[in-house]
Regions:
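Short, compositionally biased low-complexity segments
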Residues: 20-35, 173-176
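Intrinsically disordered, low-complexity acidic/Ser/Thr-rich segments used as protein-protein interaction/activation
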Residues: 72-90, 145-146, 153, 169, ...
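Intrinsically disordered, low-complexity transactivation/modulatory regions
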Residues: 1-20
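Short intrinsically disordered, low-complexity coil segments enriched in acidic
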Residues: 1-4, 120, 217
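C-terminal transcriptional activation/regulatory domains of eukaryotic transcription factors
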Residues: 32-146, 150-161
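Low-complexity, intrinsically disordered regulatory regions of large metazoan proteins
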Residues: 18-25, 41, 73
Length: 217
């Protein structure tokens, strides 16, 4: 019998025959994998930042007054500095922000274009999910990671995909607990602006989670 070294939640006893039957990777495969990972997490080449700006404007005009969890100045500044291209959490959040405003914040006179908007939003959601699909996703969540799941929840819920939506909401809630949004002592170490943002996020998640529990039961 062969035993795996290190902690694992899975059975660790394998016979030699089972071990020999496992797939192997050549040196070339191992060398290429980091490059593939870097590509997978990069900003999508087919998404032009200029096409996102009107939707970011719409987000801050239509949704931000309802869920005031982001500073429009901070988001625009980050985009102008190109941070969304090097910070996959920020890039994924921006794409999810634009997606939710395309699907949810629809005025009556815009309803005729909803199908086209939904198609584009789904593409951006796919890019958003791809940007943060790393092997260690969830190990070190950020505010951007939490909000991405929160926005994806809204997109999926509006699209009638409730099970996937609740999964994203649970992710957002779990990650918010990981960084201590439910622990008052953590707020003492933050600036006034950070405290206010985190409190708004925590309240938004708590209210949404309670609403979700109510309609599911």
């Amino acid at each position: 019998m062969q035993n795996l070294t290190g902690p694992t939640p899975f059975p660790t006893d394998f016979s030699a025959q089972e071990a020999n039957g496992l797939p192997s990777f050549s040196d070339g495969d191992i060398i290429r994998r980091p490059q593939l990972l870097e590509y997978a997490n990069s900003w999508p080449a087919e998404v032009d930042e200029a096409s996102l700006l009107p939707w970011l404007d719409s987000y801050f005009k239509r949704l931000s007054p309802i869920v005031p969890v982001l500073s429009h100045i901070a988001v625009y500044e980050a985009m102008l500095l190109g941070r969304h291209r090097s910070d996959r959490d920020l890039g994924a959040m921006i794409l999810s922000m634009c997606s939710i405003v395309m699907i949810q914040a629809v005025y009556t006179e815009e309803a005729a274009h909803l199908d086209e908007r939904t198609k584009t939003a789904k593409l951006w959601m796919q890019h958003s999910a791809r940007m943060r699909s790393t092997w260690d996703f969830g190990q070190d969540p950020t505010i951007e990671t939490i909000l991405t799941s929160f926005f994806l929840f809204g997109c999926l819920f509006s699209n009638g995909q409730q099970r996937a939506a609740w999964h994203q909401l649970r992710l957002a809630v779990d990650m918010s607990c990981q960084i201590g949004l439910d622990q008052p002592d953590v707020y003492l170490l933050k600036t006034k602006q950070e405290r206010e943002q985190r409190i708004r996020i925590y309240l938004s998640l708590a209210v949404t989670e309670r609403y979700g529990f109510h309609i599911q039961n």
